[in-house]
């Protein structure tokens, strides 16, 4: 919200400086972003009257004028502006004046004619207004008055960054209320008297969606002069709030928007067929907006229509077909309350953002419409003339918001603020904020005013009391709190432990968006319908993610495009799975995922720069799983996944249940994502790996361990893990470990076969094993794998 300090002080004028005022506003929770002067630095400029204006004898584009600036003699000034003419009131820089840029005005001759000053344009005085030629002031502008005083240019614009909950401050009225409360100062509102109707013309109004539009006011004003010029005082107020002047009708509705906080709209009455109908749009209905763009409407969009077509997207943007033009004679003024829930998000869905939608989305004072209509009518008649008809009002009282009644406990107030504020001060603060307050045994009950949609819970009242009392007035003190020991179960694996492990192995933690591009997600997780957001941040972030892999792959691409080819990332986060039986129809499951790409190690003269492969990531995943202290509980089983290479992917299985996947990204997916080179990923359900077996202390065997190596030949399709597991199944009490240490394919091994070398460790806790014990265990293992897999011992 950008506003002029001088305009604010017309409503409330506390005895504080500009710096003190902006500090007050900031400390009250309305952060001031910027304070800027409304015009450049200049002096010596006066209001003048062009008494004579004639053609320069030697220059076609110059005019010779005599200007009255309230001195004894008229000033001779040569001017080149096309709009310079006799009778004009102008801004005159007299001799000795200094304009922005340290430009000094001196006596001069232009093509032989004396010039003792300069007639100024807005730009020449450092005023940001688009205009051709010199300024044209009001005919009643006092001659000789200092121009800075005439336009009140000793003023600043204050830009406040309002939070979304403080919609009540999107106006001079709202800011004045706030400043008045902070300074215990009275707020003087402009007098708004009802405008008496002079004609009986009305337009029929029907509201078919009362929940979305509980109140709609319409008023016909005929014989309006849209060619009238917006007064300079209004243009200046609009300019200082960041709005340029367009035409008097639009300027008036914008003025009421800024002053009162009530968005309004004006229709060309001649372009309305039949009457006004406020309804929901038909799916696919089209409307051409005032900016010339065409919008295809959704069925949940509220529109203001006539009997044949949509005239405007309600509360957001007017339509071109019904807009006021230079040919307009009669207008229909609209002033309505549109429910925030029915406006919120609609503008964004059409790529629009307007001052009107910003206010309606957050909530407009629902008691403001009548006075705003009268204010706009009075200004329209004053500036453009016209004949006024009665106001037609359609209201659904049952659908209007009800004031929130909120209880505030004394104990809660003291606990949250950490300071005791006297009861009388609490009541005074709440009443100054426009609330009705009732004292109870436990504290108070406050009824929020109609302009405060954000007062809903007890903490809201605590915040209001605290910020108006002044955070600076609350003494500093150390927080007092009871320390509670965290309940930590030894069987739980803390997430921090896994994070530390991966960081120690060279990974960086990533945090990606939970919102993803839906079509891209279908490449990674085909066949599963994701939740599509009704009001997404953008089209590229319109679906809830079904897993973490998509976000990590996009992060790899982002890094590779910035000359960072070696990437090791992991992420912990939620995936969102639609489920009819889950709460709110959605399962939120914590997941752990990781990705590697590029070289195995950083570039070094003494290290080979080999590219990462499947087994690099498999080793990292095994390190995570080994935190469970039960290496026999998990396994990797060859499996296919639509996002992974069919020959380089596996399911991660724990206790017989598939809990994740690991593998190299499918070449086709690699191409579509724009990945540069081999990329390997994993994803695991966190809830399946965050528990561990509590280790038990056992005595170490004092007897020697024995190692026997066997090499078995099996089909290439047989997984080595299955062979190792088979060894453990029949190894008996003496077999302590079976480890694969070599895989060989080539000379001496039949084509289509492979040789697996396995180290068997045998040991007894009670005695030294005899050769017969060892041989018996080895023979049993060989026989079992031979029978189960058709394996044979390699010669």
From Swiss-Prot:
Subcellular location per the Swiss-Prot or TrEMBL entry: Cytoplasm
Amino acids binding Mg(2+): 454, 460, 463-464
Annotated ranges, domain tRNA-binding: 39-148
A single GO molecular function term of this UniProt record: tRNA binding
Name of this protein: Phenylalanine--tRNA ligase beta subunit
Pfam families from the UniProt entry: B3_4, B5, FDX-ACB, tRNA_bind, tRNA_synthFbeta
Alphabetic keyword roster: Aminoacyl-tRNA synthetase, ATP-binding, Cytoplasm, Ligase, Magnesium, Metal-binding, Nucleotide-binding, Protein biosynthesis, RNA-binding, tRNA-binding
Record domain FDX-ACB: where: 701-794
Cystine pairings recorded for this chain: none
Cofactor(s) essential for the protein: Mg(2+)
